[in-house]
Swiss-Prot record:
Pfam families: 7tm_1 (PF00001). This is G-protein coupled receptor 6. Residues 1-74, 131-142, 206-230, 305-309 are extracellular. The keyword Lipid metabolism does not apply. It is found in: Cell membrane. The chain crosses the membrane at residues 75-94, 107-130, 143-164, 186-205, 231-249, 278-304, 310-331. Glycans are attached at residues 2, 9, 51. The gene is GPR6. Keywords: Cell membrane, G-protein coupled receptor, Glycoprotein, Lipoprotein, Membrane, Palmitate, Phosphoprotein, Receptor, Transducer, Transmembrane, Transmembrane helix. It comes from Homo sapiens. GO terms for cellular component: cytoplasm; plasma membrane. PROSITE patterns: G_PROTEIN_RECEP_F1_1, G_PROTEIN_RECEP_F1_2. It comes from the Eukaryota. GO terms for biological process: adenylate cyclase-activating G protein-coupled receptor signaling pathway; G protein-coupled receptor signaling pathway; positive regulation of cytosolic calcium ion concentration; regulation of metabolic process. A lipid is attached at residue 345 (S-palmitoyl cysteine).
């Protein structure tokens, strides 16, 4: 009888302990919160409590008996799918430029740099998903997030370099082509990639919020001060691109006006071409701004205590810019279209005329 009572008491203690653990997990923001947030860190208790910043380690959920499986966040799945599409598109562009001697010109070197940066960004999104759920650790988180920062910084820098190249090709049309060399373009890209790599190494070298959770940004483990620097750099790049595209539009309209004076009227073909060119520039800049501006603004005004869904909802569209870049800067180009046909069809003779286009053409 005493043994039965003791067994009953032990069972009650186990039940009470289990209920207390479940309540504690719920209070700490566990699976019962019902929100799409980031996976909670394994050592959350030592970090000072849960918050809404984008975490980089996975939360464990119950699987088969004796096995714990990571609970997959649907937002992370979307980012991984986006990264897969980005990597596939840009890998094709890099392969086309690398395998076609006619595409090894300064203009296509810039496009190749953009495609390489976007390819690395896509691979980084895939690796982030894999490591987050298979090898969750703070060291791996720092490496993957630094890799993504460097890749996206190189992508934005390459876009700026392409914009500068287009502006100079129009503003100094008579002398720019003779002065522009592959060596100069390579030196420019080497400088931009060095700066981008430095921005990506900062979290790994210690500029992170692992030691002080209150200093975290909306993307953990990036420190709020580091994210503020990245956002300020983006706003500066966006402002320069906006100014240059406005200047490009002014040059285009001035050339159209000169043609009109020579011909005493602006012929409909010239007017249509001018409007089309200005419209294309608006699409290019609008796509870039619509993709990155929401995330850059939220990085400045957001807090690590805000729901993580806000971070995901602004970060996902930012990745779409790397998905659209190959379409805008590569696949619309006739030389790349011809190289693609030759790659897919072997000795197929494309009917697309091989005409060298200037960097001012989108």
């Amino acid at each position: 009888m005493n043994a039965s009572a003791a067994s009953l008491n032990d069972s009650q203690v186990v039940v009470v302990a289990a209920e207390g653990a479940a309540a504690a997990a719920t209070a700490a923001g566990g699976p019962d919160t019902g929100e799409w947030g980031p996976p909670a860190a394994a050592a959350l208790g030592a970090g000072g409590g849960a918050n809404g910043s984008l975490e980089l380690s996975s939360q464990l959920s119950a699987g088969p008996p004796g096995l714990l499986l990571p609970a997959v966040n649907p937002w992370d799945v979307l980012l991984c799918v986006s990264g897969t599409v980005i990597a596939g598109e840009n890998a094709l562009v890099v392969a086309l430029i690398a395998s076609t001697p006619a595409l090894r010109t300064p203009m296509f070197v810039l496009v190749g740099s953009l495609a390489t940066a976007d390819l690395l960004a896509g691979c980084g999104l895939i690796l982030h998903f894999v490591f987050q759920y298979l090898v969750p650790s703070e060291t791996v988180s720092l490496l993957t997030v630094g890799f993504l920062v460097a890749s996206f910084a190189a992508s934005v820098s390459s876009l700026l370099a392409i914009t500068v190249d287009r502006y100079l090709s129009l503003y100094n049309a008579l002398t720019y082509y003779s002065r522009r060399t592959l060596l100069g373009v390579h030196l420019l890209l080497a400088a931009t990639w060095t700066v981008s790599l430095g921005l990506g190494l900062l979290p790994v070298l210690g500029w992170n919020c692992l030691a002080e959770r209150a200093a975290c940004s909306v993307v953990r483990p990036l420190a709020r001060s580091h994210v503020a620097l990245l956002s300020a750099a983006f706003f500066m790049v966006f402002g320069i691109m906006l100014h240059l595209y406005v200047r490009i539009c002014q040059v285009v309209w001035r050339h159209a006006h000169q043609i009109a004076l020579q011909q005493h009227c602006l012929a409909p073909p010239h007017l249509a071409a001018t409007r089309k060119g200005v419209g294309t520039l608006a699409v290019v800049l609008g796509t870039f701004g619509a993709s990155w501006l929401p995330f850059a603004i939220y990085c400045v005004v957001g807090s690590h205590e805000d729901p993580a869904v806000y971070t995901y909802a602004t970060l996902l569209p930012a990745t779409y810019n790397s998905m659209i870049n190959p379409i805008i800067y590569a696949f619309r180009n006739q030389e790349i279209q011809r190289a693609l046909w030759l790659l897919l069809c072997g000795c197929f003779q494309s009917k697309v005329p091989f005409r060298s286009r200037s960097p001012s053409e989108v």
